[in-house]
Amino acid sequence: MRTLTLKHLRATTGRSRDAQPVPRATLLTTTACHLCEDAHQELSRRAGCGELSLEVVAVESDEGRALVATHRPAMFPLVLLDGRPLGHGRLSRRRLDAALRSGKVR
């Protein structure tokens, strides 16, 4: 397990500049996965903007195996928002936008 570390406070602490909690995205990735790379790039960008905090978990890790056992994704990556499945496979930016706007992720 590793937390994405950016120079921005909000990316590592899970708080925006005004100290409001932001949703926590967990990205479960595997090797040689272009969809994982795409999701990582988009979620990293959003973490840098303060929309969310990002934790990247490798499927080979203990935490990754536990997430696979719990959520049984059909394909990778698996994206969780505050511990709840947002989707697997290609990241739906529309679904992510809707979840962030609704405020129902917490």
Residue ranges and their predicted role:
Residues D38-Q41, A66, L91:
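Generic recognition of short, well-ordered alpha-helical segments
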Residues D62-R72:
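N-terminal beta-loop-helix "entrance" segment that forms/cooperates
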Residues L52-G64:
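Thiol-based oxidoreductase modules, predominantly thioredoxin-like and allied folds used
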Residues H71-V79:
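Structural micro-motif
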Residues M1-T13:
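N-terminal "domain-start" segment that seeds a small globular fold
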Residues R10-C49:
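Local sequence-structure signature of Cys/Sec-based thiol-disulfide redox active-site neighborhoods
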Residues L80-R106:
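Non-catalytic, surface beta->alpha helical segment in thiol-disulfide oxidoreductase systems
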